[in-house]
Amino acid sequence: MTPDEFLSALTEFDIQLSDKQIKQFERYFELLVEWNEKINLTAITEKNEVYLKHFYDSIAPILYGLITDQPVSILDIGAGAGFPSLPMKIIFPELKVTIIDSLNKRINFLSLLTEELGLENVTLLHGRAEDFGQDANYRGTFDFVTARAVARLSVLTEFTIPFLKKNGILLSLKAAQFEEELNDAKKAIATLGGKFIKEVAYELPNGDERHIALIEKKKETPKKYPRKAGTPAKNPIK
């Protein structure tokens, strides 16, 4: 997907990018490749692949109407090089984005990136989701939590649901179908106060399949969750 094909694909969803936004994506690509030589951000560095598998894929929640142009708060868990939240932020500058990442080098990259792209209302937090999930400054405060290829749902839900406001939505972006994952995660979702709402299945322009699971927070998460760092991955709620 060339940059021009990226722009053309967005117009099919009635999204027209300004010159500023086009340049922001271009600079994003340049910085991603430049920093990737110093720290491991992504295995995908070829320009057309970045535009397809990082930029286009990241904005799927916008393309399919799950996130609209409103000043809602989004927490991105394990965003790595800023996916999916920062491409969405470029499209909808009103979004209030917070990113948690456990690697300080990635936070340094994201700090430079957001400054270079002129993105405001982006908060970067260095640490573990399990720790921030017990912090009253962040717990139960977000409209959306996004996570792209971070962990299986049975683990991911413990990382994410505690951060949501009541009626907030977890958007879990997955490459493959997750029926088996969803079955494994039913106990965790219910225990944490969530409810599976629906799955959005779609294809990238090259035919690759993608899926987004929507899980809504229906009631408060018990105080014991998330458990201490490392425990959810080693011992998922069953």
From Swiss-Prot:
Alphabetical UniProt keywords = Cytoplasm, Methyltransferase, rRNA processing, S-adenosyl-L-methionine, Transferase
Q: Which residues does the annotated region (Disordered) include?
A: 216-238
Under the cellular component aspect of Gene Ontology, which terms does the record hold?
cytosol
For S-adenosyl-L-methionine, which residues are the binding ones? G78, F83, A129, E130, R148
- List GO molecular-function terms, semicolon-separated: rRNA (guanine-N7-)-methyltransferase activity
Pfam entry (one): GidB
Function comment: Specifically methylates the N7 position of a guanine in 16S rRNA.
What is the official name of this protein in its record? Answer: Ribosomal RNA small subunit methyltransferase G
List the gene name.
rsmG
